[in-house]
UniProtKB/Swiss-Prot annotation:
Disulfide bonds join C131-C222. It comes from Parelaphostrongylus tenuis (Meningeal worm). One of its GO terms (cellular component) is extracellular region. Pfam families: Pepsin-I3. Residues 95-116, 196-218 are annotated as: Disordered. It is found in: Secreted. Its main location: secreted. It comes from the Eukaryota. InterPro entries: Pepsin-I3 (IPR010480), Pepsin-I3_sf (IPR038412), Protease_Inhibitor_I33 (IPR051901). This is Aspartyl protease inhibitor. Residues 1-15 form the signal peptide. GO terms for molecular function: aspartic-type endopeptidase inhibitor activity. Keywords: Aspartic protease inhibitor, Disulfide bond, Protease inhibitor, Secreted, Signal.
Length: 226
């Protein structure tokens, strides 16, 4: 019975409206995970999620050059750090004494900050029934249709804010129901093993606001014909 209820909760979460899709904006670099997702620059032309935006200004071109240099240093430093960890691990497996291999990511180098011309405003995509909005531009399929009007831009900002609050509430609601259903028991251990569950640290269910947030009205930027 619990399993059936859990499946129903998962289905409820999946069915919750998700008109917004955030695509993380990163510039594709040689040797990394390339593709057209996020920001890509070629020939001093900026693309976001495969859509051409504009040409970089001279200042942005210099910023891109600085970023490329930092990426090269980052990749070299990361490669060396990984190599050192591998050598330490091999030494431990061979029975040699030495400092234990640290697993904390704090010792690993951090990736350089993205250039200013690749921001979430450029790469966030809002999928509606019939069209997609990115960077305040409406696309039908992969074809640019039009720019949003100033009033529509404001409407989209309000929708994004309310939709984020609403989706956060739905997720917390599901987490709370799952926590109330299974309590502090190790559900998966009891379900699969049938033996004595291991002692685990339980996470308290998130508190929900007294009043549920209202689901925002979806902006009407395009009209599909059925």
């Amino acid at each position: 019975m619990k399993l059936l209820f859990l499946c129903a909760l998962i289905a409820l979460t999946a069915a919750a409206p998700r008109q917004k899709r955030l695509t993380v904006g990163t510039i594709a670099v040689s040797g990394g995970a390339g593709g057209s997702t996020g920001c890509v620059v070629t020939g001093n032309v900026l693309y976001a999620n495969g859509f051409k935006l504009r040409e970089l200004t001279p200042i942005e071109q210099q910023e891109l050059q600085d970023y490329q240099n930092k990426v090269a240093d980052y990749k070299a430093t990361l490669k060396q750090a990984v190599k050192e960890r591998q050598e330490k691990l091999k030494a431990r497996l061979a029975g040699k004494k030495g400092k234990a291999v640290e697993t904390s990511s704090e010792e690993l180098p951090k990736a350089p900050k993205k250039p200013s011309f690749c921001s979430p405003d450029d790469t966030t995509q809002f999928y509606f029934d019939g069209c997609m909005v990115q960077n305040n531009r409406v696309y039908v399929g992969n074809t640019y249709a039009r720019d949003l009007t100033p009033s529509e831009i404001e409407e989209l900002k309000v929708f994004e804010k309310k939709q984020t609050v609403y989706q956060d509430y739905i997720q917390k609601q599901v987490q709370q129901q799952v926590s109330n259903l299974f309590g502090s028991s190790d559900f998966f251990s009891s379900f699969f093993g049938g033996g004595e569950a291991k002692q685990t640290t339980t996470t308290e269910a998130p508190e929900l606001p007294e009043e549920a947030p209202e689901q925002p009205n979806v902006p009407n930027f395009c009209t599909p014909i059925y």
